[in-house]
């Protein structure tokens, strides 16, 4: 048997505390920092490490040629309302594509040389990297998966239109080509708008490739739209991640230093460092010099503000509490029905696991900060009747059955009316008629032999004579 005396007592007490920590109880550590903030590791995030590029190429010169052809034909030969409507619609759709006019004739051509980034969601590093690869060799460097089928009309449209010149149904053929071309321009406009918003465009993927794309990866997609001045082409690219890396993140928590100053910081985001740059959990590069220096463990250039309190008890996470400049206080611990009292003071970090604690009449628990979610529906559930698909023959049969039922009901009602009339005419009315005849005979007899009866007469209102007007 060991006696807890002398130097063994504090060592044994420390051992008991450590055992309690690893036994899912409570952990209390000193905070030794004088920076004005604390750094906490947060949940790791999945960051794309490599991408697969899917693109759509649009030849602006060929679009201009096709538009000019339609315009010339409308000026000379054809004035069908459908053709004029579609042509005007094409011009409206092209006007929505926000590119500069090269000249009066061109709708969306631009003068320049090489590739230029128009818009998208690439950061500066990705943009520069992709532009270099495009300038060197698009096919070998970026490995674009092109969808030439999507612009098949533009590639061979002129040949088809020339073949229709000798056809008697040229109006119908021209109308059909206009419809196809209009649909293509609408797809082009939609593709550019989705690229501007950073949304995935399914038209940039063949069905077989779309099957192999992870939906989670699509959420991390990047988009870019480029203009190739040399070939007068617009290039719309979807950058779909094919590999994701798990990276730990760091959260910055303001915490007073020994002089009572803490970091002037209110953001709740977490950050990570990659290739000497700092990003937030949305994978966007952080430009704040204060934050980037803190994450990189450099001398931060930040603003600090004084705290206006003598001591602090503060939540950090649902299971973590920090204290600052705390006077000696009793911490009541309730872990798995084991109740203890612990004296704490100063700057401490308290981690709770499956426990409840009380400090200065403030109760804390591991799940105290987790929100209670009310799953009560905000609407009255609908009683939905299952709909059965009815065929044509079934409908005819149902109508026939309903008609038969209606006829039967009508016949029953008619028979009931006839029976009721017969009953009233020949059965029920006869006693009443006999009674009426007897009463009439008795009345006649009373009139022939009047009897002295006292009848109380009901007084009538007095009738005053009229007074002639005085002349």
From Swiss-Prot:
Top-rank taxon: Eukaryota
Residues bearing glycans: 3, 59, 167, 325, 363, 383, 403
Keyword line: Glycoprotein, Transposable element
Protein name as catalogued: Retrovirus-related Env polyprotein from transposon 297
Organism: Drosophila melanogaster (Fruit fly)
Gene transcribed to yield this protein: env
């Amino acid at each position: 048997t060991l006696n807890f005396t002398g130097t063994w007592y504090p060592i044994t007490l420390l051992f008991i505390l450590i055992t309690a920590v690893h036994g899912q109880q409570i952990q209390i550590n000193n905070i030794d920092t004088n920076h004005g903030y604390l750094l906490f590791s947060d949940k790791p995030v999945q960051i794309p490490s490599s991408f697969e590029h899917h693109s759509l190429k649009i030849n602006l010169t060929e679009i201009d040629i096709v538009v000019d052809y339609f315009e010339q034909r409308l000026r000379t030969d054809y004035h069908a309302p459908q053709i004029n409507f579609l042509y005007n619609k094409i011009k409206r759709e092209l006007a929505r594509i926000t590119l500069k006019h090269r000249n009066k004739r061109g709708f969306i051509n631009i003068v320049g040389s090489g590739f230029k980034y128009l818009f998208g969601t690439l950061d500066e590093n990705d943009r520069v990297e992709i532009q270099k690869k495009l300038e060197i060799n698009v096919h070998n460097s970026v490995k674009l998966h092109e969808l030439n089928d999507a612009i098949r009309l533009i590639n061979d449209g002129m040949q088809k239109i020339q073949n229709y010149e000798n056809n008697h149904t040229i109006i119908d053929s021209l109308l059909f080509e206009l419809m196809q071309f209009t649909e293509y321009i609408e797809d082009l406009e939609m593709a550019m708008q989705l690229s501007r918003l950073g949304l995935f465009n399914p038209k940039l993927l063949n069905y077989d490739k779309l099957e192999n794309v992870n939906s989670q990866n699509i959420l991390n997609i990047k988009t870019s739209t480029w203009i190739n001045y040399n070939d007068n082409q617009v290039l719309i690219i979807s950058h779909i991640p094919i590999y994701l890396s798990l990276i730990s993140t760091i959260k910055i928590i303001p915490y007073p230093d020994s002089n009572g100053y803490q970091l002037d910081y209110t953001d709740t985001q977490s950050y990570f460092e990659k290739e000497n740059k700092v990003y937030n959990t949305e994978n966007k590069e952080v430009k704040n010099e204060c934050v980037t220096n803190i994450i990189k463990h450099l001398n931060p250039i930040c603003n600090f503000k004084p705290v206006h309190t003598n001591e602090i008890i503060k939540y950090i996470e649902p299971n973590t509490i920090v204290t600052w400049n705390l006077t000696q206080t009793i911490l009541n611990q309730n872990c798995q029905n084991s109740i203890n009292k612990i004296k704490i003071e100063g700057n401490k970090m308290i981690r709770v696991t499956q426990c409840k604690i009380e400090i200065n009449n403030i109760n804390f628990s591991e799940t105290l900060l987790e929100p209670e979610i009310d799953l009560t529906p905000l609407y009255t559930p609908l009683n939905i009747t299952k709909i059965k698909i009815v065929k044509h023959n079934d409908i005819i049969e149902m109508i026939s059955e309903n008609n038969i039922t209606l006829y039967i009901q009508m016949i029953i009602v008619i028979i009931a009316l006839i029976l009721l009339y017969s009953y009233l005419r020949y059965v029920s009315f006869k006693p009443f008629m006999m009674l009426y005849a007897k009463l009439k005979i008795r009345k006649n007899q009373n009139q022939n032999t009047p009897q002295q009866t006292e009848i109380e007469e009901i007084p009538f209102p007095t009738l005053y004579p009229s007074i002639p007007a005085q002349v």
